[in-house]
């Protein structure tokens, strides 16, 4: 017997027994059920996280970044469509323009406000720690300054930085992001600044290089430029690696050119603990700079920090964000963690 039918008949029998008993028993008052409060989601969840992070955020820049969550808008649900390989994503409007046969091969993906702000990478407020690091090394940003995020991953932190008055550019190769952030208001003016989103390989594609432009006060890359992804020193599955499509010298020259004189570049990588030698290699566990000190220097940069450890601060942040209590994928932030950053500067 199907489970639904069993449940239906059980419920019916229970109702009949209750009806018979009710005629012989005095009426009783059933206390109302307590409905638990809905868990904050989307922009509200980020505002809640900001309150938790504020007491451990050390810089004015970080505090302003958290406070800007008050300006994050609510976002209406939207639907994306992807092919079976997930190499191509379409907006609802783009999918509607396809032939019936093409549309039938697509899978729909429902995007709520939480997915809009977090995509598949979790809270964008994890950027607050890199901002604290930058401030501790003397970085100051003025309204109108340009900020570039290489491999931005989600739009939330870009909007927060734009709310502070910065002109922010995010570049990424993930085809989902192009479709996800294609509605009016996803980019453009935001607060006192602006958000520009570019989809394509930087610096391999000259058109993307031209669109990125120059004059940046800050270039930041979080969890993308890892040695394990780009120059693994152990065998790794090629599908988990990143091919920048150019020599290291050419890549570093392109980053150098984006910065204004005196501009700063930060690589900040939060990783699981480095894979032991007797275990299969996990590329994203090696968060060291993919570029050597000699390569940075040859490109013209001044190296301020190379593979500096930052575990304690991120452990604290991770607990406040609940990474260790995630019901689907709890992270052992006490033991299974590595955090490294590299900070370089273009001479003024």
Per-segment meaning from a language model:
Residues 121-144:
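Conserved alpha-helix/loop element of class I SAM-dependent methyltransferases that forms part
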Residues 143-153:
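Conserved class I S-adenosyl-L-methionine
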Residues 154-165:
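Conserved SAM-binding loop of SAM-dependent methyltransferases across substrates and taxa
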Residues 167-172:
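Conserved SAM-binding motif I beta-strand of class I
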Residues 207-218:
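A short acidic, Gly/Pro-enriched loop at the edge of an enzyme's catalytic core
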Residues 234-261:
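A short glycine-rich, Lys/Arg-flanked "PGG" loop and its adjoining helix->strand segment in the class I
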Residues 262-269:
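Conserved beta-strand signature within the Rossmann-like core of class I S-adenosyl-L-methionine
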Residues 283-347:
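Class I S-adenosyl-L-methionine
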